[in-house]
């Protein structure tokens, strides 16, 4: 008798990394909504979506962790720029 899980079920580690990626994506899109110029806002939304789509098929854990770190840095940079623009 085999496992009850479907063959494509994620391991706990994969699930946690996926949640981290989705959380980062949501944070980026929330920050982008704070951009005052509508054209810049659309550009940044498309850029973020394309970056995540382009890397959707990544499976190597080290590469995914590096991409998460890179995304977090870019989010911090965006938040810093937005904070400076408001000042």
From Swiss-Prot:
GO biological process: mitochondrial respiratory chain complex I assembly
Top-rank taxon, per record: Eukaryota
Cellular component GO terms, alphabetical: mitochondrion
InterPro entries listed in its UniProt record: Complex1_LYR_dom (IPR008011), Complex1_LYR_LYRM2 (IPR045293)
UniProt KW Transit peptide keyword: yes
Key words of the record: Mitochondrion, Transit peptide
Protein's cellular compartments: Mitochondrion
Primary subcellular site in the record, as a coarse category: mitochondrion
Transit peptide: 1-19
Family: Belongs to the complex I LYR family.
PANTHER family: LYR MOTIF-CONTAINING PROTEIN 2
Function: Involved in efficient integration of the N-module into mitochondrial respiratory chain complex I.
Protein name according to UniProt: LYR motif-containing protein 2
Organism: Xenopus tropicalis (Western clawed frog)
